[in-house]
C-alpha cells in the first residue's frame, strides 16, 4: 500500500469528524482521472479540528512516517508526511461554510465528499484561484453527469 492510501486509512480510523474532498477525493474514489499532489481533509467542527495535530502524530506513528508542520493557522494546517522515498502534503481545513450536501460517502474507513459538493467547491475555486487542476476536475465531473451549470446558482 502506498503512503497516500495508508495515511488515509489510518487517519480515518482515528476520526469520523473529517472528510476527504478535492482532487484526491475525485481521483481516488470516483473517477481516477489525474494524480493529485495533496490530501484535503476537512472538518466542520472547530472542536474536532482542534484535535488534528494529535491525530496526525498518532497516524504517523502508526504507519511509520514522519511529519513536519508547514503552515499552522486557526482554520488551516498543512503537513508534509514522509516515509522512505515518499512524501505527501496533507491539508487540514476547518470548513466554516455550511455544506450544501452534508452527507458523505464512506469507502472503507474514508469519509469522502459527494461529487455534487465538489462541483460547487470547484466552481468557487475557479473564481478564486483559476488553476488548471480545477478545470480538469470540473471537466471530469461534467463528463460523469455532474453538470456544472446545474450547480452554478448554489455556488
Residue spans for each PLM region:
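Compositionally biased terminal segments of proteins
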Residues: 1-155
Amino acid at each position: 500500500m502506498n503512503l497516500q492510501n495508508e495515511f488515509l486509512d489510518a487517519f480515518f480510523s482515528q476520526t469520523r469528524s473529517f472528510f476527504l474532498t478535492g482532487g484526491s477525493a475525485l481521483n481516488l474514489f470516483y473517477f481516477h482521472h489525474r494524480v493529485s499532489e495533496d490530501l484535503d481533509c476537512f472538518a466542520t467542527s472547530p472542536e474536532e479540528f482542534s484535535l488534528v495535530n494529535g491525530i496526525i502524530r498518532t497516524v504517523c506513528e502508526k504507519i511509520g512516517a514522519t511529519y513536519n508542520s508547514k503552515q499552522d493557522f486557526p482554520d488551516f494546517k498543512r503537513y508534509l508526511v514522509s516515509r522512505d522515498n515518499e512524501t505527501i502534503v496533507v491539508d487540514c481545513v476547518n470548513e466554516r461554510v455550511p455544506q450544501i450536501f452534508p452527507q458523505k460517502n464512506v469507502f472503507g474507513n474514508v469519509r469522502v465528499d459527494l461529487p455534487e459538493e465538489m462541483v460547487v467547491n470547484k466552481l468557487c475555486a475557479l473564481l478564486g484561484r483559476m488553476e488548471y487542476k480545477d478545470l480538469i476536475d470540473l471537466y471530469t465531473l461534467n463528463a460523469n453527469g455532474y453538470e456544472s451549470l446545474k450547480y452554478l446558482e448554489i455556488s
